[in-house]
Each structure stands twice: as C-alpha cells, then as structure tokens.
Amino acid sequence: MATSAVPSENLPTYKLVVVGDGGVGKSALTIQFFQKIFVPDYDPTIEDSYLKHTEIDNQWAILDVLDTAGQEEFSAMREQYMRTGDGFLIVYSVTDKASFEHVDRFHQLILRVKDRESFPMILVANKVDLMHLRKVTRDQGKEMATKYNIPYIETSAKDPPLNVDKTFHDLVRVIRQQVPEKNQKKKKKTKWRGDRATGTHKLQCVIL
C-alpha cells in the first residue's frame, strides 16, 4: 500500500505537553514515539521539544511535543508551557504510588492555568511492563480517569513498545473533537519551536 505524500504547507499544528513526576518515563515515551528507540536513562534536568509530521486518521498534522522536566526546581516553568499547550499527557508510573497521587496536582494546575472546567488530556499509566513492581492497579487508574472525565491508557516504552504511538495520536483526536481543525491552522507558531532537522531543541530556564 502506497504512503500518501506529506503536504508541504497549511498543516494544523498541535502543541502537546507531556507532564508528570520525574522518573515516570516521560522522556522514554517521547523518544520512543519520535525516534523508535528505548532510552532507559535520560538526563532529568533537560526539557526537550520535538517536531514531527504525522498522519492521523488520514489527516496530516504537525505534532510539536514538549517533554517536560518533572523535578520541583523546574516548577516555575510549568505555567508558561501550560498556557500554550493544546493538549496534555499526564504520565505516572505504575511502579510509583506517589507519582499516581501527584496526578491530581497536575490536573488541577492545567485547569487553573487554562481557566477551564475541562481540557484535552489523557491519563497515561506507564511502565506496565514491570508487572512484578506494579503498585497502582488498572482499576485505580481507570477510576481516577473517570473522576476527571478523561481517557485512560496503559503504556510501555520498552521494546516492544505498548500503545506509545496510540497515546500521542489519541490526544490529537481528543483535541480535534474540541477544536475545529481550520482554527488550528490560524494559530501562532509555537514558542518552543524544535529543530526541523533533528526534531529536538534544548530549552533553557531564565531566572529573572
């Protein structure tokens, strides 16, 4: 089956933000999605953005993904990227009960910054390949997602990956349901523009 050519212009851009505690596997998920490799260790002090043309449900789009740092010292940057994000993946590790308990903090902060009662988000239960270390059950995750009225998905970035592409694609689908695509084309360019050649750009925190 032939692959359709990538349109060169007039593509909608979706700014997706990956949030969650440090060490839950946000970078591993993002790198697996963009580069199709599993990186078990990653510098926790770096925030990266990635740019990718992708086809979802026969519609091409540009995904501009910000992989955020989970450490508290970067908390001052959170409101900035939350203001410009079109959708959010709230990630926790099923092996880390504290990261699950902190989901509420991220959820409430997003709604407060957006000044909305609801916003495109997906609750992501990561590291499900580590079944012997699992501390948060599927039912607990689903219950929390139902409480927030957002989708729930279980993932693993480790090869072979589980639901990695689906997670990012599903978030775009949620955004499309709420925001007409024609309006997406009129949006201003992202503030965390990635390098088109490498698909990644290191962000720096400036303290005023």
Swiss-Prot record:
<feature type="binding site">
    <location>
        <position position="27"/>
    </location>
    <ligand>
        <name>GTP</name>
    </ligand>
</feature>
<dbReference type="InterPro" id="IPR020849">
    <property type="entry name" value="Small_GTPase_Ras-type"/>
</dbReference>
<feature type="binding site">
    <location>
        <position position="126"/>
    </location>
    <ligand>
        <name>GTP</name>
    </ligand>
</feature>
<feature type="binding site">
    <location>
        <position position="27"/>
    </location>
    <ligand>
        <name>Mg(2+)</name>
    </ligand>
</feature>
<feature type="binding site">
    <location>
        <position position="44"/>
    </location>
    <ligand>
        <name>GTP</name>
    </ligand>
</feature>
<feature type="lipid moiety-binding region" description="S-geranylgeranyl cysteine">
    <location>
        <position position="205"/>
    </location>
</feature>
<feature type="binding site">
    <location>
        <position position="127"/>
    </location>
    <ligand>
        <name>GTP</name>
    </ligand>
</feature>
<feature type="short sequence motif" description="Effector region">
    <location>
        <begin position="42"/>
        <end position="50"/>
    </location>
</feature>
<keyword id="KW-1003">Cell membrane</keyword>
<comment type="function">
    <text>Signal transducer in the Ras-MAPK signaling pathway that regulates cell proliferation and survival. Core component of the SHOC2-MRAS-PP1c (SMP) holophosphatase complex that regulates the MAPK pathway activation. The formation of the SMP complex only occurs when MRAS is GTP-bound. MRAS has low intrinsic GTPase activity and may require additional factors for activation. The SMP complex specifically dephosphorylates the inhibitory phosphorylation at 'Ser-259' of RAF1 kinase, 'Ser-365' of BRAF kinase and 'Ser-214' of ARAF kinase, stimulating their kinase activities.</text>
</comment>
<feature type="binding site">
    <location>
        <position position="42"/>
    </location>
    <ligand>
        <name>GTP</name>
    </ligand>
</feature>
<comment type="similarity">
    <text>Belongs to the small GTPase superfamily. Ras family.</text>
</comment>
<keyword id="KW-0547">Nucleotide-binding</keyword>
<dbReference type="GO" id="GO:0000164">
    <property type="term" value="C:protein phosphatase type 1 complex"/>
</dbReference>
<dbReference type="InterPro" id="IPR005225">
    <property type="entry name" value="Small_GTP-bd"/>
</dbReference>
<feature type="binding site">
    <location>
        <position position="129"/>
    </location>
    <ligand>
        <name>GTP</name>
    </ligand>
</feature>
<feature type="binding site">
    <location>
        <position position="40"/>
    </location>
    <ligand>
        <name>GTP</name>
    </ligand>
</feature>
<keyword id="KW-0342">GTP-binding</keyword>
<protein>
    <recommendedName>
        <fullName>Ras-related protein M-Ras</fullName>
        <ecNumber>3.6.5.2</ecNumber>
    </recommendedName>
</protein>
<feature type="modified residue" description="Cysteine methyl ester">
    <location>
        <position position="205"/>
    </location>
</feature>
<keyword id="KW-0378">Hydrolase</keyword>
<feature type="binding site">
    <location>
        <position position="156"/>
    </location>
    <ligand>
        <name>GTP</name>
    </ligand>
</feature>
<keyword id="KW-0636">Prenylation</keyword>
<dbReference type="GO" id="GO:1990830">
    <property type="term" value="P:cellular response to leukemia inhibitory factor"/>
</dbReference>
<feature type="binding site">
    <location>
        <position position="21"/>
    </location>
    <ligand>
        <name>GTP</name>
    </ligand>
</feature>
<feature type="binding site">
    <location>
        <position position="24"/>
    </location>
    <ligand>
        <name>GTP</name>
    </ligand>
</feature>
<feature type="binding site">
    <location>
        <position position="45"/>
    </location>
    <ligand>
        <name>GTP</name>
    </ligand>
</feature>
<comment type="subunit">
    <text>Component of the SHOC2-MRAS-PP1c (SMP) holophosphatase complex consisting of SHOC2, GTP-bound M-Ras/MRAS and the catalytic subunit of protein phosphatase 1 (either PPP1CA, PPP1CB or PPP1CC). Interacts (active GTP-bound form) with both SHOC2 and PP1c (all isoforms) to form a tertiary complex; SHOC2 and PP1c preferably bind M-Ras/MRAS, but they also bind K-Ras/KRAS, N-Ras/NRAS and H-Ras/HRAS. Interacts with RGL3. Interacts (active GTP-bound form preferentially) with RGS14.</text>
</comment>
<dbReference type="GO" id="GO:0030742">
    <property type="term" value="F:GTP-dependent protein binding"/>
</dbReference>
<dbReference type="GO" id="GO:0005886">
    <property type="term" value="C:plasma membrane"/>
</dbReference>
<dbReference type="GO" id="GO:0007265">
    <property type="term" value="P:Ras protein signal transduction"/>
</dbReference>
<feature type="binding site">
    <location>
        <position position="25"/>
    </location>
    <ligand>
        <name>GTP</name>
    </ligand>
</feature>
<feature type="binding site">
    <location>
        <position position="45"/>
    </location>
    <ligand>
        <name>Mg(2+)</name>
    </ligand>
</feature>
<dbReference type="InterPro" id="IPR027417">
    <property type="entry name" value="P-loop_NTPase"/>
</dbReference>
<keyword id="KW-0488">Methylation</keyword>
<feature type="binding site">
    <location>
        <position position="26"/>
    </location>
    <ligand>
        <name>GTP</name>
    </ligand>
</feature>
<feature type="binding site">
    <location>
        <position position="67"/>
    </location>
    <ligand>
        <name>Mg(2+)</name>
    </ligand>
</feature>
<dbReference type="GO" id="GO:0005525">
    <property type="term" value="F:GTP binding"/>
</dbReference>
<feature type="binding site">
    <location>
        <position position="158"/>
    </location>
    <ligand>
        <name>GTP</name>
    </ligand>
</feature>
<feature type="binding site">
    <location>
        <position position="28"/>
    </location>
    <ligand>
        <name>GTP</name>
    </ligand>
</feature>
<feature type="binding site">
    <location>
        <position position="23"/>
    </location>
    <ligand>
        <name>GTP</name>
    </ligand>
</feature>
<dbReference type="GO" id="GO:0003925">
    <property type="term" value="F:G protein activity"/>
</dbReference>
